[in-house]
């Protein structure tokens, strides 16, 4: 069912035969790439690595592209221009630490993309409750009961699984989609996000945590996309900036007094300082 929904959305929104896919080693991007392939689109996969550090996501994207006979363009994101890149990210109104870290590689990917339409698996994580907080609350009845007791004890509002998921899709949340799209607009591309389609959302929001993730994380996708089996082990969810090492790279900016002008210990605080600084100056 999910495969058909993704295919239908791709067919209805992408008029060109060729499509770029930001491909990683995760279920979300692989599934939309397969859906595009099965919908008759010519897939051109793009993936990045930091300098000479080959990540799981990059290696798996290259492997899958080879097996599927997709064109694959590797993007090497430099690590020696970080201060200048920080200022570029500030101009894109990055606010949170994750905004800076997740938009950073896109500064180098989008200039290389040849196609008009760029396909991603954006938003899929929001349905599955793969965060630590979600799993502690919704992954089984015992954890739900513990969450209920905690809310009563601390006089907090208890969120249903759907309420928790809906919060993910708010305009200024959704894994920083708004900031990603600032880069998309700069390079005159069209960002296609099949997992944010209303038909896809309705289907997945009607599933509980167990239906979505048992016996394996994102099982409902794995079961529908049988081609995934030929790609070997597909690792569980890991955020882009963590799996690629971008977060570790950005921690080096703590030692840069020009960037870390308040002597902070965490990049979370440095990011906030810059957002406030720019907002005040505007």
Predicted segments, located by residue:
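Active-site nucleotide-sugar/metal-binding loop of Leloir-type enzymes
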Residues: 109-114
């Amino acid at each position: 069912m999910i495969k058909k929904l993704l295919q239908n959305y791709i067919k209805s929104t992408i008029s060109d035969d060729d499509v770029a896919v930001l491909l990683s080693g995760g279920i979300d991007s692989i599934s939309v790439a397969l859906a595009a392939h099965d919908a008759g689109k010519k897939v051109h996969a793009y993936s990045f690595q930091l300098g000479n550090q080959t990540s799981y996501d990059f290696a798996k994207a290259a492997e899958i592209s080879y097996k599927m006979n997709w064109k694959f363009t590797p993007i090497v994101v430099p690590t020696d221009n970080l201060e200048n890149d920080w200022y570029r990210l500030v101009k894109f109104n990055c606010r949170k630490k994750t905004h800076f870290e997740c938009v950073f590689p896109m500064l180098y990917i989008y200039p290389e993309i040849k196609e008009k339409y760029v396909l991603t698996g954006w938003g899929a994580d929001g349905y599955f409750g793969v965060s630590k907080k979600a799993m502690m609350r919704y992954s089984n009845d015992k954890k739900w009961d513990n969450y209920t007791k905690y809310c009563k004890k601390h006089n907090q509002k208890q969120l249903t699984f759907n309420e928790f998921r809906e919060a993910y899709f708010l305009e200024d949340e959704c894994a920083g989609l708004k900031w990603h799209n600032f880069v998309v607009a700069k390079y005159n591309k069209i960002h296609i996000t099949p997992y944010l389609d209303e038909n896809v959302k309705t289907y997945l929001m009607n599933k509980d945590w167990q239906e979505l993730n048992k016996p394996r994380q994102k099982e409902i996708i794995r079961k529908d996309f049988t081609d995934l089996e030929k790609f070997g082990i597909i690792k569980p969810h890991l955020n882009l900036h963590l799996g690629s090492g971008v977060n570790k790279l950005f921690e080096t900016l703590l030692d840069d007094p020009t960037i870390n002008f308040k002597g902070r210990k965490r990049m979370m605080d440095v990011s906030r300082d810059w957002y406030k600084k720019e907002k005040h100056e505007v």
